[in-house]
Amino acid sequence: MKLVDEAEILVTAGNGGNGCVGFRREKFIPLGGPDGGDGGAGGSVWIVADENVNTLVDFRHERTFKAQRGENGMGRQAYGKGGEDRIIVVPVGTVVINVQTDEVIGDLTRHGDRLLVAKGGKGGLGNMHFKSSVNRAPRQATTGEEGEERLLKLELKLLADVGLLGFPNAGKSTLIRAVSSATPKVADYPFTTLYPNLGVVSVEAYRSFVIADVPGLIEGAADGAGLGTQFLRHLQRTRLLLHLVDISPALGVYGEGGVDGVSPADQVRTIERELERHDPELLKKPRWLVLNKADLMFEDEARAAAESIVAELGWTAPWYLVSALGRDGTFPIMKDVMAFFDRQREDELDARNAG
């Protein structure tokens, strides 16, 4: 299924029912007092996260959501029935934004998370509330309040532990196929990946993590070149980034206005510049360098090229030389990633215990 990760919807809560003007009409009580009941409250609109939903595609067909209006009050102090709430189901990882204010209303990161996005109006008061010593037969009641209305933007941010960065054709999709059961499209031309892909990497029994492959970046992506940076939001929740670089000398032309024959070190610098322009927080995440396509060179040449790239960059974080296509060197990376997460959990536990 095609991933749709943005949608705009209009939500409208139900109005409250009106209060009733009524009087007791019983035998032998000719001057019965007021008995008009209150109107029912309008229904509210809720957004609920469901782990069984994977995309926002349904919102391309239905963009308006209304809750039920409250019923009017009636005589004999009968209250109107409250309107039914409207429930909107979204994938886990959805961020809800108020379009008018650009404020983030909520971030639904767990199955079953609920968010009130439009509150129903209160019911109006019946005339029984307006009886006084000077007004024994009030003909006054109030109308119900209007329900809230909001224009909302829904943004889906995939929940992945590891994110893959790199130029188009760096081999990100090949790597995710090699280490997980995901089957993204793989071909020898740029921008094969048009939408994010998720894969689950199992290192040992009951020990796994989720890895995300997003479309590649090129120079000028922050200005919309190539596929732009619209998919980078899916890397914001990751705990580790793997930066893939094609070290083979036969570099292709990466799209109109793209890069022709850029050195591997300059590929890394270009991605870093685009991240700095679009989302500097991503640069603060732990990032490991994965030098891919070693199978296109002799082993000694590949090792020498990798060491030269690392030296040119002054790279101090972990780095790896792999062939994603041949799966050479991919499993050690995944083992190291799992060990990295284990250390993170231990550090977090120690910090909580110390506090």
UniProtKB/Swiss-Prot annotation:
Q: Does the keyword Cytoplasm apply?
A: yes
Q: Gene Ontology terms, cellular component aspect?
A: cytoplasm
Q: Which compartments does it reside in?
A: Cytoplasm
Annotated GTP binding sites:
166-173, 191-195, 213-216, 292-295, 323-325
Cofactors, names only: Mg(2+)
What broad class of enzyme is this?
hydrolase
Per UniProt, what is one Pfam family of this protein?
GTP1_OBG
Domain annotation Obg: ranges? 1-159
Its GO biological process annotations read: ribosome biogenesis
Give the Gene Ontology MF terms in alphabetical order: GTP binding; GTPase activity; magnesium ion binding
- Keyword terms: Cytoplasm, GTP-binding, Hydrolase, Magnesium, Metal-binding, Nucleotide-binding
* Cross-referenced PROSITE patterns: G_OBG, GTP1_OBG, OBG
* Record text on subunit structure and interactions: Monomer.
Stated role: An essential GTPase which binds GTP, GDP and possibly (p)ppGpp with moderate affinity, with high nucleotide exchange rates and a fairly low GTP hydrolysis rate. Plays a role in control of the cell cycle, stress response, ribosome biogenesis and in those bacteria that undergo differentiation, in morphogenesis control.
Q: Which NCBIfam families match?
A: Obg_CgtA, PRK12297.1, PRK12299.1
State the similarity comment: Belongs to the TRAFAC class OBG-HflX-like GTPase superfamily. OBG GTPase family.
For this entry, the protein name equals GTPase Obg
Instruction: Give me the gene this protein comes from.
Output: obg
